[in-house]
């Protein structure tokens, strides 16, 4: 019954037939589940009827003698090569839902990464797109890769996320984009939660949203990595049904799947099964059991065929992989498929995505300019920061509360000559607090955003420079407001000179130090392979910066062989600038009630702190150089990370 239903889908009845066929075969379903499947049927049928999607060429992918090897051992001592994929050949056609299966470690994800263009170095063989050698940048624009983990920005609503995707990927009028987004959300059953933030979506909704985001520009090729991972059976059925519908709409849909249920297994059009990096079966689903039977492997009557082939590949019935490898290499799969279903798998003459005779050469340029991408990404990043309770609200409140606490602790000491060292302690702590308040939130959040950036950039949403400029500029207003709020509290409460120019310089130095610290946080976040690494490296890098700041040890007392380290401490220039701002600029004598006050004259304070010869403009200049250098270095690290992904 299920087989007939699948054939009906091929004839154009829509994947809803699958839902009804399986339901009738399994017996009477509870009314709630029946209603749910009815809704799924309606949504999936709609997924084939997109009217506003841009027209694209249908794509067939062929790979010949594909192999992949990696170097073993650490970078300083390579021990040779390890081959992960060996001599894979085959063809994935339009209008087909292809499942790549195999036990853990078989090479499924590696194989799909190579097909998608995410891995290049170490690959041998040939990949053809519509019979021509693949041009990677062009292919990346006509394909999309939906990863196993649905990395979404948590503070955007479903509709906002979709509009960002549409604005980046399409050059149409805004009304057309809105109609397209509405059509996709309706078809995928997400319209009811269009104003819900992505962090509050269920697993199935997140997966469908990840598909919807990539569907905006109607990619002819779609790659899915373990799309059913972590989902319940109903959500798994929805996702696979949706993929099948997208495939039968004229796309080539390829997914890795570990061990599907029998119901999901029958929904695939073709299988490509791997074991130990080699192919042990390729062909239509219905041909798997007869093919294995011809090789002397009999699947038990009530056993899930997907479970059986995984057990065979894992060696539970003996080491049969060499025999299966040879059978595929000798063309037994192809012969068995032609024998069992002659002419059944021929492609339809017309593809609704785009007439095959057009087959245009697509450009690899982006749909929008770099400036447009920057504006869209700036707005998205700014909105995300504004809505982030931890990153923004807590950060703002911490500056207010710490400012009040410090103001009370150092109340009215700024003009007291007997408390000069207390005041310098206040100035140093201000630099310390502003540094960590800017450094750590960036260190903690940027690695989490890296996964979203990598997915969107590799799926050709935008350029690296547009993203980085938007990320750099969007947080600047917050890095200005928070230090100014802190300075406005502590400067006056601690009784510093009541001069507007000194207050403005004090605030400017605080802002400059915070921006440099944030730049260092971006660099650490971009270079770190995980959040744990970033969390450790962030505070550790602060230790030498503080140690050579000039507060704990003056420059003259630092050993000669370590004095160069003092020039690399950006806190030194911020702290030095604050000392010059408070006690320099020809400030008059300080108030002192004691009989002896050696620090009544501010020049003595400057001499004691070894900043008498320092220039305030040089401190600003060096902080500016630090800011630009760290931002540029973070950009280069991001660029390297993107290239290393391939």
Curated annotation (Swiss-Prot):
Residues 1-393, 447-472, 525-532, 639-646 are cytoplasmic. It is an enzyme of class 7 (translocase). Its EC number is 7.6.2.-. One of its GO terms (cellular component) is endosome. Disruption phenotype: Abcg4 deficiency does not significantly affect the levels of sterols in the brain except for brain lathosterol levels, which are slightly elevated. Abcg1/Abcg4 double knockout mice display significant accumulation of 24(S)-hydroxycholesterol (24S-HC) and 27-hydroxy-cholesterol (27-HC) in addition to the cholesterol synthesis intermediates, desmosterol, lanosterol and lathosterol. Residues 415-425, 494-503, 554-617 are extracellular. InterPro entries: AAA+_ATPase (IPR003593), ABC2_TM (IPR013525), ABC_transporter-like_ATP-bd (IPR003439), ABC_transporter-like_CS (IPR017871), ABCG_dom (IPR043926), ABCG_transporters (IPR050352), P-loop_NTPase (IPR027417). Highly expressed in the brain, in particular in neurons, microglia and astrocytes. Expressed on blood brain barrier endothelial cells. Expressed in the spleen. One of its GO terms (molecular function) is protein homodimerization activity. It is a multi-pass membrane protein. The chain crosses the membrane at residues 394-414, 426-446, 473-493, 504-524, 533-553, 618-638. ATP binds at residues 102-109. ATP-dependent transporter of the ATP-binding cassette (ABC) family that may be involved in the cellular efflux of sterols, in particular cholesterol and desmosterol (a cholesterol precursor), to high-density lipoprotein (HDL). May play an important role in the removal of amyloid-beta peptides from brain, in a process that can be antagonized by desmosterol. However it is unclear whether ABCG4 can directly transport amyloid-beta peptides or whether peptide export may be facilitated due to changes in the membrane lipid environment. Induces apoptosis in various cells. Whether ABCG4 is an LXR target gene, is still under debate. Studies performed in monocytes, and in one astrocyte cell line indicated that ABCG4 expression could be up-regulated by oxysterols and other LXR ligands. However, subsequent observations in a number of different cell types (primary mouse cells, oligodendrocytes and neuron-like cell lines) have not confirmed this observation. Half-transporter that forms a functional transporter via homo- or heterodimerization. Homodimer. Heterodimers with ABCG1. This is ATP-binding cassette subfamily G member 4. It comes from Mus musculus. The lineage of its organism: Eukaryota, Metazoa, Chordata, Craniata, Vertebrata.
């Amino acid at each position: 019954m299920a087989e007939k239903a699948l054939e009906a889908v091929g004839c154009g009845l829509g994947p809803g037939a699958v839902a009804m066929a399986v339901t009738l075969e399994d017996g009477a379903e509870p009314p709630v589940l029946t209603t749910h499947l009815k809704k799924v049927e309606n949504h999936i049928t709609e997924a084939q009827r997109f009217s506003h999607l841009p027209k694209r060429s249908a794509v067939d992918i062929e790979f010949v003698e594909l192999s992949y090897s990696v170097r073993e051992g650490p970078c300083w001592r390579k021990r040779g090569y390890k081959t992960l994929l060996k001599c894979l050949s085959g063809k994935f056609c339009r209008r087909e839902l292809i499942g790549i299966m195999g036990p853990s470690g078989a090479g499924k994800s590696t194989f799909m990464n190579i097909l998608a263009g995410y891995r290049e170095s170490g690959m041998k063989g040939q990949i053809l797109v519509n019979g021509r050698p693949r041009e990677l940048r062009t292919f990346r624009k006509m394909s999309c890769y939906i990863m196993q983990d649905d990395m979404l920005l948590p503070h955007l609503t479903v509709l906002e996320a979709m509009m960002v995707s549409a604005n980046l990927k399409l050059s149409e009028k805004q009304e057309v984009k809105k109609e397209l987004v509405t059509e996709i959300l309706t078809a995928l059953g997400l319209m009811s939660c269009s104003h819900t933030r992505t962090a509050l979506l269920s697993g199935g909704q997140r997966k469908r949203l990840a598909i919807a985001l990539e569907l905006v520009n109607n990619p002819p090729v779609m790659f899915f990595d373990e799309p059913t991972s972590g989902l319940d059976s109903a959500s798994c059925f929805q996702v696979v049904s949706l993929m099948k519908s997208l495939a039968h709409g004229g796309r080539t849909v390829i997914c890795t799947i570990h061990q599907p249920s029998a119901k999901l297994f029958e929904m695939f059009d073709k299988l490509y099964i791997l074991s130990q990096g080699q192919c042990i079966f390729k062909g239509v689903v219905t041909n798997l059991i007869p093919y294995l039977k011809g090789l002397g492997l009999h699947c038990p009557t009530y056993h899930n065929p997907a479970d059986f082939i995984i057990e065979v590949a894992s060696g539970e019935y003996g080491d049969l992989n060499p025999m299966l490898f040879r059978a595929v290499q000798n063309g037994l799969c192809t012969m068995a498929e032609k024998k069992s279903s002659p002419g059944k798998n021929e492609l339809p003459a017309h593809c609704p995505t785009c007439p095959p005779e057009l087959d245009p050469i697509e450009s690899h340029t982006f749909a929008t300019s770099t400036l447009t991408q920057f504006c869209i990404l700036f707005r998205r990043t700014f909105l995300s920061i504004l809505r982030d309770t931890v990153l923004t609200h807590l950060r703002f409140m911490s500056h207010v509360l710490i400012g009040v606490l410090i103001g009370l602790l150092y109340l009215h000491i700024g003009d007291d000559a007997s408390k000069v060292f207390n005041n310098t302690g206040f100035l140093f702590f201000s630099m310390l607090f502003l540094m960590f308040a800017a450094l750590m939130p960036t260190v903690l959040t940027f690695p989490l955003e890296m996964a979203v950036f990598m997915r969107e950039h590799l799926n050709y949403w935008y350029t690296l420079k547009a993203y980085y400029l938007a990320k750099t500029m969007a947080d600047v207003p917050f890095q200005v407001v928070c230090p100014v709020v802190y300075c406005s509290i502590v400067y006056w409460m601690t009784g510093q000179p009541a001069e507007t120019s000194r207050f403005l310089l004090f605030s400017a130095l605080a802002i400059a130090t915070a921006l440099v610290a944030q730049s260092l946080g971006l660099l650490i976040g971009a270079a770190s392979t995980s959040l744990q690494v970033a969390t450790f490296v962030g505070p550790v890098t602060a230790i030498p910066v503080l140690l050579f700041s000039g507060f704990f040890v003056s420059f003259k007392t630092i050993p000669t062989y370590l004095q160069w380290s003092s020039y690399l401490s950006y806190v030194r220039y911020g702290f030095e600038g604050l000392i010059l701002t408070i006690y320099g600029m020809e400030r008059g004598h300080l108030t002192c009630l004691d009989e002896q006050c050696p620090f009544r004259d501010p020049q003595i304070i400057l001499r004691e702190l070894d900043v008498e010869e320092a220039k305030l403009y040089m401190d600003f200049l060096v902080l500016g150089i630090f800011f630009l250098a760290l931002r540029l270095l973070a950009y280069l690290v991001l660029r390297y990370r993107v290239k290393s992904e391939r």
